[in-house]
Amino acid sequence: MNQEYILAKEKFATIGIDTEKVMTELAEIPVSLHCWQGDDVCGFDSDGGPDGGIQTTGNYPGKANTPEELMADIEKVLSLDGGLHKLNLHASYAIFTEENKADRDTLRPEHFAPWVAFAKKHGMGIDFNPTFFSHPKAQGLTLSSPDEEIRSFWVRHGIACLKIAEYFANETGIPCVMNVWIPDGYKDIPADRIGPRARFMKSMDEILATPYDKTKVYITLESKVFGIGLESYTVGSAEFGMGYVLSRGIVPLMDNGHYHPTEMVSDKISSMLLFSEKLALHVTRAVRWDSDHVVRLDDETREIAKEIVASGRIKDIFLALDYFDASINRIAAWTAGLRNFRKALLIAMLTPNARFTELQNQGNLTELFVLQEEIKGYPWGAVYDEYCRRQGVPAGEQWYREVENYEKTVLVNRK
């Protein structure tokens, strides 16, 4: 073992932390990797880019343009992070042949068979997202549309995706999280706020009326405060989302970029866990709005991880990443965010949370404050480097050398 790790192991032992146990447990935590970082949320079922209040900025060379390129890029990222992973797909990443093209309301499992083969190759489960944007029938309102033809089209899309999600679970043997997020809303002050939300509720009820195995598919609902072009009103608000999931017995999903900048998802996790058996998270980094910057090892990322671990409910929480940055190398963006979130989980697991809780309950807030600050200087980095070595992935910044080589040999050849 590395001497730095031996010293770190001894240091953490003084506060009752077994680093060997922590590394074993960290390797067993699945993090769902979002496919859309690799191609700027473009997908394969249309020629246009993302809409619905979603915006990818930058034009760094090397964007994946085909399923084969995207899969190759994901494989590179997987090789640079140790631990369990899942693959997070949007419905817009269906892979068609000339013979089986379909619109979104008639998508079938066969359109995702190549992704299943890819996931099986890497021992991963698949999470899924109906895509209610970047489509001719997604012009402002989808599941909340007053146009019955439009609304029913998107209901059929949701039902088709539910069947595909169950297919993923059956094929991989790992439960699938199917997340619903819609971009519905208005740029300016609406005349009627309750009508669209009532229609959204009706649409969700119709999707949920489809029989499915609740041990294999977990349906989640994601809210949002606003998006570009939807500044004044968002149908799927936080209050709607919370009320709906708790009344229907599905799973709340919180994206830490989908709230007002002064709201912290880290403070919401404990409350949601008291009222819901399961919880799903999209970890991102919001800069003044839902900008989906690459996840850094910043205060909120660390606090989210701390709340996940300290809750004692980590097995009840579905963890996923959600960001997209085209201003830097996309493989580096993917990898950095993934490794940063795993570092945050490691730091949380190396924290004597039980001791800190005891001090809080004793009213010894001075010692609690001091220890919370002092532990920030503990050598968690040496533990992370040892974890990487044991997982067979590069420690430290050496992973970026592999990304540079991949760019020079693979990405540079893309148009």
Tell me the role of every PLM-derived stretch:
Residues 1-146, 153, 162-164, 170, ...:
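Alpha/beta catalytic barrel-like cores
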